[in-house]
UniProtKB/Swiss-Prot annotation:
Its EC number is 2.1.1.182. Disulfide bonds: none annotated. S-adenosyl-L-methionine binds at residues 28, 30, 55, 77, 103, 122. This is Ribosomal RNA small subunit methyltransferase A. It catalyses: adenosine(1518)/adenosine(1519) in 16S rRNA + 4 S-adenosyl-L-methionine = N(6)-dimethyladenosine(1518)/N(6)-dimethyladenosine(1519) in 16S rRNA + 4 S-adenosyl-L-homocysteine + 4 H(+). CDD domains: AdoMet_MTases (cd02440). InterPro entries: KsgA/Erm, rRNA_Ade_diMease-like_C, rRNA_Ade_Mease_Trfase_CS, rRNA_Ade_methylase_Trfase_N, rRNA_adenine_dimethylase, SAM-dependent_MTases_sf.
Amino acid sequence: MSAIDGLPPLREVIARHDLRAKKQLGQNFLLDLNLTAKIARAAGDLTGCDVIEVGPGPGGLTRGLLAEGARHVLAIEKDARALPALAEIATAYPGRLEVIHGDALEIDPLAHLTPPIRIVANLPYNVGTELLIRWLTPAAWPPFWQSLTLMFQKEVAERIVAQPGGKAYGRLAVLAQWRTEARIVMTLPPEAFVPAPKVHSAVVHLTALPGPRYPADPAVLNRVVAAGFNQRRKMLRASLKGLHPEIEALLIQAGIAPTARAEEIGLEQFCALARGLAAAPR
Ligand code: SAM
């Protein structure tokens, strides 16, 4: 079956450009263009948006983004072998696809884009988590992007959207949910990828809130959450002891039982504690 964009099927593209997946680049490709179109739709209405795609590889998701109407796609790819395949896509969508060859961890794509900007990526898990944390912790809020639509290992996706009370709830959940609305919008079995990874995957869609859910200084909140979850089995009066000599009183003032553990504490209480700490004389 020929694709709606008139380009060849992805299996053919991969064979022609000898794009055999390399493990060290975390390459697990999506070859089903119906699926990549569905992921592109999960990113929201792309018409009138510039989209940053990180790790386009042979371009399945890139084709989905363009077919779903993205105004402009800026694709950052580390593997030079993918560039000829991406150039063919750029020719099929004149003026709408720009490809940068490089490491997404080292490139600032902003110079190339006009808001509104959405970010979409199917990346190796470690690169994806590092970029997510950077995108969630800019110097100022709101950030330059409107939404992030990112593929993760399912277990990592569950940590991003986790609620208090379970093992999945930790720093990543607090960081993500403090300033975004985060949802799992799709789960994918290993067979959706070539080659198939060992684990299930999930797409998380994060929409930037105009401001944080509850006021707090980001650095203080980060300190509280890091200390609390680094020793998540300990009671907070012990795990947070190093933050302030009067930590028990500050916990009580924030409405938190000093005997509680970090994984029982919701965002609102963490923020109240961060405010109390910031205001407390030492
Ligand atoms: N988006 C394609 C798809 O869905 O079929 C490819 C996904 S594959 C999981 C990850 C892609 O990210 C590969 O093309 C790989 O070369 C690229 N990649 C890995 N590390 C990268 C980095 N640091 N910067 C940019 N691209 C990277």
